[in-house]
């Protein structure tokens, strides 16, 4: 060993004990574990200096040698010391002179005395003792520096108290100036000022110490190369200023503090007495009234927290100049935030507060900096800088200047003072720019009050209050208003907590955190007005679909991590994280809300990343409160040990587990039992097929570590972000990622995604309640505040009105002036061509166009500089640290709507686009117009045709705009499309923020746009994802104004080509057309057509699905001028890949042409979420990865369930004209609710009934779930997933590309009952009573008594009326178009009558109302009523049919057209008694794997017939009645079952059906021109002859029987249909049918369309009932279902589809047309009627 070495040498090494055997063992073990984790790139910061050991004198090197050898060959320490550590950072070799300049922050410069450079390289003298600590034996208090407690937890106690060297340290050696001015060679240099290296790692760290060291000294700035958890130390400091080292916490710091205190007692007193006695005590938030401005109040909290922390550190001897630097930096940042986020007079108070604190710390900071100055290090750095510069490594400026900047001397303090003072002066650019705006806003900036808002409805209830959807009366924006009962707060002594929530919400500026607009008090309530996030919360999503797909979990969790990181950086501990508080925006992203239990602690300081502080931080709050939601409470809270930020990471672990598994890991019948599990139990992990991915399980288990200090995330969110689970995730582009679940809203007031929780909480708003006495709670009066976001609303309104008066004579128009271009510093000049489009009213722009962009990049650094920049009048103030806050604010106040195309890199320089040709104009809504409908798009300006007819008002709804805006985020650089029309883009004030382009194409309706009202202040655009693929369905309507090409001579100057676009992994493809070549200088080139763009429309006619010749024909028909709408291919979800090997097997999904038709559905509401789900049920494919959908169901082909297809044109949904393949319309599992959860049979659209939350959300306890948490995971049944939500399982090759497989096949853990609700996507009838829980088995259903059914029916009828409203009404024309392709295939509306019947087209209407089956008596009455309505309808139909011919998409009025559905007699017979899987739930979704499922609906009628995703009401017996009838009809070739019958049909029509079909082909054709395409060619010949179901391929489903079916009796345009659809064989379902069913089944009738997936099909004992029905009403079995108006005339053909006793209205019935022209065209037409009509 080295024992012979003199103590002196050891002194150099700092701690001789290291060679003791125990130390060696410890180090070996610890280092072997952590060796790989050490950061290679950070010099002194990874084992700061210890292993760098640049001993240059011979003595040093010999010592080093001995040391290294002495530890033994195997020692890891030796290996670490020997390895060259400076790979990424400059490498420090053994010679000091080669010390190259480390990257900023990577070298411990602060008290650099801590490195092991024990003596100067040139000095022959031996080093002096390192510090007084060396001589300290720990025996005499006098010997030890004040406050030195090596074992105190507050710092690393790595240096043992015992030192071998007994010399005392004399302060006499300290240079009096505090600056070490001696040269390195000077023997006089003081050991403290020149050679002392303040932070070196202990030489004998314990395992825990090393663990913490490696685990916690990490920064978010340096990404971990290997993506692992990053325990390696990373450079933390973000500045090159002197003396700022990342890891200054060693006993050496204490020594330095000791020296400092001994030397400068007055400065010490100033630090420790003055702040504690005066500053903190007099300014603490508890001692002063809360500031009225929430943001300032938050900043006030932070300033006091910083003062407290500074005091604690000073008393503990842990302050360093680096700490002061960071403190100052944070104070400056808070000041900046104060200026940016508040216009309140209280800003002066905060400025004063900050100045006081800065003055307090100024002198100590400077003195410490002097003490810590290390001339030797300075010279080393100088040499390194010279070498670095010589090597051309980027130091371009002259070296002296570089050195000066390294020293932090470049800042001119006078200049900074001037800037500070200028904040208050009237002549700042900010005030100058916004003087006018402020003048305008001052008068209007009245204090908000309850009278300013009108309450629309209750969103949800909570323990303390309720949240309401409200609309601001003047701006018409929607907000969520949280009303908290003051009396409750006072009684619980939680008033302060309400202020904390207000402050956090007001201050937070992050795209993943809900923002607040204003707060005020009423007599009984404190009200907070926040942005309304439409998509509900994750808890509801979990209840409805069970465990989420891993990709979806990754996105949601990552976004929550960013939100949490942001909060923690600002010292906010949420304390109540749970899925209920994670809201889903209209774009499918996450926003964190509910800060009612949050605490505000200290902002993150990198200097606090040391063990002691991390421990302290983890125990930051010692209030002993156990608060939060029991399942998510961390062990340390339960044990009342003190807690801090780690509690949020624990909750994140629970949330992650819940997302992945579907239930929480710990549960109990009582909180005590639950807590016992949390503290002691092991986590149970799913096994087998349900096993979680290893990385997900690993992340969850690390987050759920019992010890908060070892919990992942405790040191920083960075280590969570580096976990392999997020490998490959782009943290800065999360908002640009496609969300898998996109809420589909039927109107701007749709709150169906929220659970009102009325049964759990009821807050009575009794007006007679006594006013709360406010004596003793004066602070409540300070609650009213108005955030800059909200005040901007008023100012921009004023500005808009001024501009309006100035510019637009017509009172109804407001033009968005661009006059302020010059003002936009950070906004590139408005040079992008703006596509003018008219949108509802000025506020829309304000809201819509505001881009709250998040610079996620910032989220990586300690408190993210305001992460969201809003421009253009969004009520959110611009918070752009990078830019003077003035610009954005100025613009917002002035109401300037600046849309600027960001340049590719996001810089704000103007883009070289043509000057604006048009003005962006807002059309004001006529007073009477429902705010929901935005005026139709008009493109004003030369050369742009009016899109008004094409895009209905809704089309342009703000959502479309928002989406468009976001889509841009996806980074198409402007250069890529400069020549392409681009809307002016709103650019965030900060150049670094994400830039959004709004290509004009987006303005037209975006198929996916959900029906948000233009006025809705829906979730900030920041939450919108700009994923190009989602919004641009390949086939989606052109969102930018069409390009008009004027033919020159005989040429247009471009070539187009048809391309195959395959649906996911299937062999089914659709034909799209792209611009293959554009001649330079030709007419097309001049018009702006670009090569490689996808053509969506020609002359307003969608070309998706048309063959090449048809498109050419369209072009040529247009004469000398052709209008072509295109979208860049990269904006679609079409992916380019190698040619398919089996292309010869591929089948083309074609769609019938349909005219754009009117969108007429403006007044239609989409049904509630669950109904939506029904539409999308099929989309809920649980398969975990979406990868299989290579095309990721572009909206154009999005599954029927996809919003694109929902035909209920919600105000927002694009006009049908833009809608993509109608086929998509049928969402097979209309009910995407397929609940993945075991109790999936929940009614899929509980929401339908009166907006209550998806029914069954709370009611049924899924099997998976323990009772304790039962309310959470209910059947997944009601929430529609976005088309992308579940990737279809690859095996389902036949799966129709249009629908993503239902989740059924998905997670094993929650078997999805096969009863997928197949409701027509359109039919939202699922308004089944929430309580109704489908019987678990077909048997039960059978057994259920008629009485129960009758009762259920009555209830259902009540509910139906409202649900009816929501039914999606598709104009028949449209339906026809959409349905035609599929219509051919019988809709297999399981359990619902498929609306295939002629009326079926009412799909738009087809709200499958799972009316509980009715008793026969009821049925009879219904029939009578139906007959009456039939007669009326026939009359209407005649009118409508003529309309249909002209208008294929007439707004639903074409009920008469419905017959076109009937063309599928096969469909009707397909209704197969099997009940079409009805037995199970007619709502069953088609399985992804068709083969397993059995026949799939061939060419499902576009959802028209899909029965409402009918959720069986527990009391309902299977629909016994109508089925036999329908079946018989189907079997009887002569009898054309009423066309309207939309019962599920087996994929292959029976012979009878075929005959019937042929009989009516002509009539149908006349009625529905597209009928020919629909003809049920899909029935395979074989099936027709054999009684067994023929094979139906998904293709058939997708394309409609005409294409898919082998027979293709009538393919569109006479094209032969592919017989290949037989790929998927439909299992014989007959065996599933009850004997009665089998009997009626004609030989040709294929098995049920839907094989019951995993649920045995129910055999319905409906024969007798059906027979009765037939007897009563042989020709039409239609059940009337009350429509929204209460009229029960919903015609549902009984026979074709088996109706369960609860007759379900067929999808066909259309809700009354907008115009009300069509009252009830829902009746299914019998063949006779069809003939009459024709």
From Swiss-Prot:
Main location: membrane
Region (Disordered): 112-197, 216-246, 421-451, 802-834, 849-895, 919-947, 1005-1032, 1133-1484, 1501-1553, 1606-1734
Residue spans of biased composition, Basic residues class: 1142-1156
Catalytic activity, EC: 2.7.11.1
Record key words, sorted: ATP-binding, Cell junction, Cytoplasm, Cytoskeleton, Kinase, Magnesium, Membrane, Metal-binding, Methylation, Nucleotide-binding, Phosphoprotein, Serine/threonine-protein kinase, Transferase, Ubl conjugation
Positions where Omega-N-methylarginine occurs in the chain: 942
Composition-biased stretches (Low complexity): 185-194, 1010-1026, 1178-1211, 1225-1250, 1280-1303, 1346-1355
Record GO terms (molecular function): ATP binding; magnesium ion binding; microtubule binding; protein serine kinase activity; protein serine/threonine kinase activity
Domain (PDZ) ranges: 1042-1130
SUPFAM superfamilies from the UniProt entry: MAST3 pre-PK domain-like, PDZ domain-like, Protein kinase-like (PK-like)
UniProt-annotated binding residues for ATP: 459-467, 482
Modification type Phosphoserine: residues: 6, 14, 88, 91, 149, 230, 815, 817, 836, 841, 970, 1194, 1275, 1302, 1385, 1711
Record bears the keyword Membrane: yes
Membrane topology: Peripheral membrane protein
Post-translational modification: Phosphorylated and ubiquitinated. N-terminal ubiquitination leads to degradation of MAST2 by proteasome-mediated proteolysis. N-terminal phosphorylation appears to be a prerequisite for ubiquitination.
Gene3D superfamilies listed in its UniProt record: 2.30.42.10, MAST3 pre-PK domain-like (1.20.1480.20), Phosphorylase Kinase, domain 1 (3.30.200.20), Transferase(Phosphotransferase) domain 1 (1.10.510.10)
Superkingdom: Eukaryota
Protein name (record): Microtubule-associated serine/threonine-protein kinase 2
Species for this entry: Mus musculus (Mouse)
Gene name tied to this protein: Mast2
């Amino acid at each position: 060993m080295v024992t012979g070495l003199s103590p002196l040498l050891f002194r150099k090494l700092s701690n001789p004990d290291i060679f003791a055997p125990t130390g060696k063992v410890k180090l070996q073990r610890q280092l072997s574990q952590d060796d790989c984790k050490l950061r290679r790139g950070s010099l002194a910061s990874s084992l700061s200096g210890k292993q760098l050991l640049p001993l240059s004198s011979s003595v040093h090197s010999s010592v080093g040698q001995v040391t290294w050898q002495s530890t033994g060959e195997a020692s890891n320490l030796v290996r670490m010391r020997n390895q060259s550590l400076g790979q990424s950072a400059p490498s420090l070799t053994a010679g000091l002179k080669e010390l190259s300049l480390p990257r900023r922050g990577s070298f411990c410069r602060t008290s650099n005395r801590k490195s092991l450079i024990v003596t100067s390289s040139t000095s022959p003298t031996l080093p002096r003792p390192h510090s007084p600590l060396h001589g300290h034996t720990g025996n005499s208090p006098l010997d030890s520096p004040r406050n030195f407690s090596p074992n105190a937890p507050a710092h690393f106690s790595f240096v043992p108290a015992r030192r071998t060297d007994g010399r005392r340290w004399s302060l006499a050696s300290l240079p009096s100036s505090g600056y070490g001015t001696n040269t390195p060679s000077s023997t006089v240099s003081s050991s403290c000022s020149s050679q002392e290296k303040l932070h070196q790692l202990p030489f004998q760290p314990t395992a825990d110490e090393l663990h913490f060291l490696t685990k916690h000294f990490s920064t978010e700035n340096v990404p971990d190369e290997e993506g692992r958890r990053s325990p390696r130390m990373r450079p933390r400091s973000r500045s090159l200023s002197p003396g700022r080292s990342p890891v200054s916490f060693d006993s050496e710091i204490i020594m330095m503090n000791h020296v400092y205190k001994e030397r400068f007692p007055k400065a010490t007193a100033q630090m420790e007495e003055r702040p504690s006695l005066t500053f903190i005590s007099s300014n603490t938030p508890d001692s002063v009234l809360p500031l009225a401005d929430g943001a300032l109040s938050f900043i006030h909290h932070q300033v006091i927290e910083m003062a407290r922390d500074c005091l604690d550190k000073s008393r503990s001897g842990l302050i360093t100049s680096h700490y002061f630097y960071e403190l100052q930096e944070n104070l400056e940042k808070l000041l900046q935030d104060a200026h940016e986020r508040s216009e309140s007079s209280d800003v002066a108070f905060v400025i004063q507060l900050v100045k006081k604190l800065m003055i307090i710390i100024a002198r100590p900071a400077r003195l410490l900096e002097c003490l810590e100055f290390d001339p030797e290090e300075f010279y080393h750095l100088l040499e390194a800088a010279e070498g670095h510069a010589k090597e051309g490594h980027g130091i371009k400026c002259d070296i002296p200047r570089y050195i000066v900047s390294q020293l932090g001397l470049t800042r001119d303090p006078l200049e900074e003072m001037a800037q500070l003072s200028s904040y208050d002066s009237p002549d700042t650019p900010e005030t100058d720019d916004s003087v006018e705006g402020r003048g305008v806003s001052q008068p209007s900036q009245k204090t908000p009050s309850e009278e300013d808002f009108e309450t629309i409805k209750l969103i949800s209830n909570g323990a303390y209050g309720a949240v309401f959807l409200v609309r601001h009366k003047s701006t018409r924006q929607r907000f969520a208003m949280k009303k908290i009962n003051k009396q409750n707060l006072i009684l619980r002594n939680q008033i302060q907590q309400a202020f904390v929530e207000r402050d956090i919400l007001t201050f937070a500026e992050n795209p993943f955190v809900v923002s607040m607009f204003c707060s005020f008090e009423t007599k009984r309530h404190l009200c907070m007005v926040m942005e309304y996030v439409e998509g509900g919360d994750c808890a509801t999503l979990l209840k409805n679909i069970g465990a989420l797909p891993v990709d979806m979990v990754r996105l949601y969790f990552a976004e929550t991590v960013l939100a949490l990181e942001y909060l923690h950086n600002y010292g906010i501990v949420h304390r109540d994280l749970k899925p209920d508080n994670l809201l889903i925006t209209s774009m499918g992203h996450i926003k964190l809300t509910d800060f009612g239990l949050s605490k505000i602690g200290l902002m993150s300081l990198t200097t606090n990343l040391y063990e002691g502080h991390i421990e302290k931080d983890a125990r930051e709050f010692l209030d002993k409160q156990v608060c939060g939601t029991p399942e998510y409470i961390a062990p340390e809270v339960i044990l009342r040990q003190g807690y801090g930020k780690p509690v949020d990471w624990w909750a994140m672990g629970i949330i992650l587990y819940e997302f992945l598994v579907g239930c929480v890991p710990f549960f109990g019948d009582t909180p005590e039992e639950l807590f016992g599990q949390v503290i002691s139990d092991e986590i149970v992990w799913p096994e087998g097929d349900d096993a979680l991915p290893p990385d997900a399980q690993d992340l969850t288990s690390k987050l759920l570590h019992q010890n908060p200090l070892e919990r992942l995330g405790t040191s920083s969110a960075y280590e969570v972000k580096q976990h392999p689970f997020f490998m490959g995730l782009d943290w800065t582009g999360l908002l640009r990622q496609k969300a898998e679940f996109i809420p589909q809203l039927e109107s701007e007031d749709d709150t169906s995604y929220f659970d009102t929780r009325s049964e759990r909480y009821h807050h009575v708003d009794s007006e007679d309640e006594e006013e709360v006495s406010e004596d003793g709670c004066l602070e409540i009066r300070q609650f009213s505040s108005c955030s800059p976001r909200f005040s901007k609303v008023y100012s921009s309104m004023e500005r808009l009105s001024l501009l309006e008066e100035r510019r637009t004579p017509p009172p109804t128009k407001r033009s968005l002036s661009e006059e302020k271009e010059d003002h936009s510093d950070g906004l590139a000049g408005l040079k992008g061509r703006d596509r003018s489009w008219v949108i509802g009213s000025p506020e829309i722009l304000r809201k819509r166009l505001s881009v709250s962009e998040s610079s996620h990049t910032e989220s990586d650094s300690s408190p993210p500089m305001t992460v969201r920049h809003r421009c253009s009048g969004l009520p959110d103030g611009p918070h752009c640290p990078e830019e003077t806050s003035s610009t954005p604010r100025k613009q917002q106040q002035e109401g300037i709507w600046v849309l600027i195309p960001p340049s590719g890199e996001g810089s704000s320089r103007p883009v070289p686009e043509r000057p604006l040709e048009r003005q962006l104009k807002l059309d004001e809504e006529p007073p009477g117009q429902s705010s929901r409908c935005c005026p139709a798009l008009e493109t004003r300006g030369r050369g742009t045709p009016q899109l008004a007819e094409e895009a209905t008002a809704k089309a342009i709804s703000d959502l479309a705009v928002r989406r468009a805006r976001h889509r841009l985020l996806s980074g198409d650089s402007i250069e890529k499309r400069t020549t392409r029309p681009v809307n002016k883009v709103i650019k965030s004030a900060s150049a670094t923020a994400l830039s959004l382009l709004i290509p004009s194409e987006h303005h037209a309706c975006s198929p996916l746009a959900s029906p948000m009202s233009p006025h809705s202040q829906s979730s900030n655009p920041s939450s919108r994802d700009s994923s190009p693929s989602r919004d641009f369905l390949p086939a989606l309507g052109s969102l930018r104004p069409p390009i008009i090409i004027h033919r020159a001579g005989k040429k247009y100057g471009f070539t187009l080509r048809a391309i195959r676009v395959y649906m996911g992994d299937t062999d089914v493809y659709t034909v799209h057309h792209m611009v293959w070549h554009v001649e330079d200088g030709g007419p097309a080139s001049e018009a702006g057509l670009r090569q490689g763009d996808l053509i969506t429309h020609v002359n307003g006619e969608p070309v998706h699905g048309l063959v090449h010749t048809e498109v050419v024909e369209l072009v040529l028909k247009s004469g000398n001028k052709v209008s072509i709408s295109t979208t860049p291919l990269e904006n679609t979800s079409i992916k380019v890949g190698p040619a398919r090997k089996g292309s010869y097997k591929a089948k083309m999904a074609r769609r019938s042409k349909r005219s754009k038709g009117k969108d007429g559905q403006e007044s239609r509401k989409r049904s509630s979420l669950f109904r939506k789900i029904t539409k999308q049920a099929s989309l809920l494919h649980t398969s975990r990865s979406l990868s299989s959908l290579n095309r990721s169901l572009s909206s154009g082909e999005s599954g029927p369930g996809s919003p694109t297809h929902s035909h209920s044109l919600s105000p927002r949904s694009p006009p049908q004209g833009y809608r993509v393949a109608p086929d998509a319309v049928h969402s097979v599992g209309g009910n995407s609710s397929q609940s993945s959860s075991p109790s999936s049979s929940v009614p899929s659209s509980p929401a339908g009934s009166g907006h209550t939350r998806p029914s069954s959300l709370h009611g049924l306890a899924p099997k998976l779930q323990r009772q304790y948490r039962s309310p959470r995971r209910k059947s997944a049944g009601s929430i529609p997933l976005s088309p992308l939500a579940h990737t279809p399982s690859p095996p389902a090759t036949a799966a129709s590309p249009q629908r993503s497989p239902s989740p059924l096949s998905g997670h094993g853990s929650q078997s999805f009952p096969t009863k997928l609700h197949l409701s027509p996507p359109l039919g939202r009838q699922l308004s089944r009573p929430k309580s109704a829980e489908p019987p678990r088995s077909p048997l039960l259903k059978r057994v259920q008594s008629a009485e129960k059914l009758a009762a259920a029916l009555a209830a259902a009828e009540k509910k139906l009326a409202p649900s009816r409203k929501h039914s999606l009404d598709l104009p028949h024309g449209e339906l026809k178009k959409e349905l035609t392709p599929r219509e051919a295939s019988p809709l297999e509306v399981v359990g619902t009558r498929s609306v295939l019947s002629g009326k079926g087209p009412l799909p738009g209407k087809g709200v499958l109302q799972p009316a509980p089956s009715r008793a026969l008596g009821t049925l009879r009455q219904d029939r009578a009523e139906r007959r009456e309505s039939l007669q009326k309808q026939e009359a209407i139909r005649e009118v409508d049919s003529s309309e249909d011919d002209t208008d294929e998409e007439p707004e639903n009025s074409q009920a008469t057209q419905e017959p076109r559905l009937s063309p599928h007699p096969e469909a009707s017979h397909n209704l197969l008694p099997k009940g079409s899987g009805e037995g199970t739930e007619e709502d069953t979704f088609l399985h992804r794997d068709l083969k397993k499922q059995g026949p799939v609906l061939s060419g499902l009628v576009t959802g028209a017939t899909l029965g409402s995703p009918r959720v069986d009401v527990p009391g309902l017996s299977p629909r016994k009645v109508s089925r036999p009838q329908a079946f018989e009809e189907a079997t009887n070739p002569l009898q054309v079952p009423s066309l309207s019958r939309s019962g599920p049909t087996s994929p292959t029509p029976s012979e009878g059906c075929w005959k019937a079909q042929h009989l009516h082909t002509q009539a149908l054709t006349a009625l529905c021109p597209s009928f020919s395409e629909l003809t049920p060619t899909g029935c395979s010949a074989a099936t027709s002859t054999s009684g067994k179901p023929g094979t139906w391929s998904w293709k058939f489903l997708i394309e409609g029987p005409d294409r898919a079916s082998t027979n293709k009796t009538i393919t569109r345009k006479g094209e032969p249909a592919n017989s290949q659809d037989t790929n998927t064989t439909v299992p014989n379902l007959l065996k599933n049918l009850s004997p009665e069913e089998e009997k009626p089944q004609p030989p040709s009738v294929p098995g049920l369309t839907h094989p019951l997936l995993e649920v045995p099909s129910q055999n319905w004992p409906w024969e007798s009932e059906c027979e009765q029905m037939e007897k009563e009403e042989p020709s039409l079995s239609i059940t009337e279902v009350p429509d929204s108006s209460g009229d029960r005339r919903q015609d549902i053909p009984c026979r074709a589809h088996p109706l369960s006793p609860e007759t379900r209205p067929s999808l066909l019935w259309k809700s009354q047309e907008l115009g009300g022209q069509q009252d009830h065209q829902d009746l299914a037409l019998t063949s006779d009627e069809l003939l009459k009509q024709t």
